[in-house]
Amino acid sequence: ALGAGVSENGFVLKYAMPDMSTATGQEKPDEDPVSVLTLSGRDFQEIEAVYNRSQEKFLDLGHLEVLILDEQILEEGAREALIGYLKQEEHIGEDVYVFRTDMLGDVFHWKGARKSSIGEYLQGIQENRTSGQQKKGVTLREVYHQFCQDGTLPWLPEVWVEGELLEVDYGSNE
């Protein structure tokens, strides 16, 4: 999962990176299966430069499943910068599910019942249901389409943490 928000100095990106030893079944009992990296900068290019200087692994956004946006980045000015950044990232697929939250930090540090990452959990809500139970998610393709039409974003499902639970509001689409 990738989270995007506004910080005092510009923007913040949160990367939830699953531990590959967990994904391959080689986890150690005391290790956290998901790590969250938070980086901030004046713009998204600066954040990416900080990532490239500080991380040994290539930032592969080709496996991105979920994009979670804080409420401030949805405002005019910030959303244009975000859409511009996402469109130039050629590895981000348009079938990524998009959510909004006013609890970006809490959502990214939420621990699922099976210690799944936030991205895996939200993607599972979308895709692992019988046809009658499926939720209508909003994809990045729909975000791009509406943004190109009139400069706004579609209504996005909201996600938040309530106690130990992660809750999702799909609005009238439920």
Could you describe each region identified by the protein language model?
Residues 1-174:
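Membrane-proximal alpha-helical signals and transmembrane carboxylates
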